[in-house]
């Protein structure tokens, strides 16, 4: 589920699709059903709202895709307040029209709360459409396993509800690189399994989250030596040092192991701070992340 892509058909033609369902059998996946790009397009809908209504970047440098910013806004809004205006742009068919955006744009320009309310409408609509689509396929093709991919799968507000929506699903997998960059993984896998007919690889031996560059102590020391006029450093072996620094309201960066693939930090690189400080969220957003005040953070929880 994404903004669109091309599927090659057995008759030699290509069809542009935005939502498709597949079933995994042994070492291959097989198409169940595809949806034409002009019928349902949640990905394009988010792109249009991100750029046309909120004036944010839909992709590319320097900001990349800022749909995640809109998703963060949605948690502070009333999804019903501007539903009548939302319905003018998004008809009953889940596809964005090329209609008049001016009313929504004026609201966003004049009042910050309106941004949150419009974002909440967008998120609620997304939840409804995706829930119906996935539910339809699970009803027709019952399965205890569900795998999601495509840029829309980055919408964690929506995906976080899936286990509640479908309690019959026992296993949910969302690749850490579900958007276009994941083609670098999907292409070789397709050849490996479909073309060369190699067997499946057990999930525990096939995690794709940590495929980035790994920095070793020698290379770290080399960089520190290069920048010794600007950076002071001290080697510490006591783990309590991090806790003491956080207690004094310092912001700590930590990393270890290979860098994560995808757009979410998954533990190998993290920013740590004391959540008890009432000003810490604003400090990190303003001075470290350089982003809007409402952007949220994920807690780190020790098992």
Predicted stretch roles:
Residues 1-91, 135, 145, 154-155, ...:
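Flexible beta->alpha loop and helix N-cap segments adjacent to enzyme active/binding sites
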Residues 70-124:
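Active-site cores of enzymes that catalyze phosphoryl transfer or operate on phosphate-rich substrates
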Residues 27, 108, 112-115, 140, ...:
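A generic structural signal for ordered alpha-helices
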Residues 120-144:
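Phosphate/ATP-binding catalytic cores across multiple sugar-kinase/actin-like superfamilies
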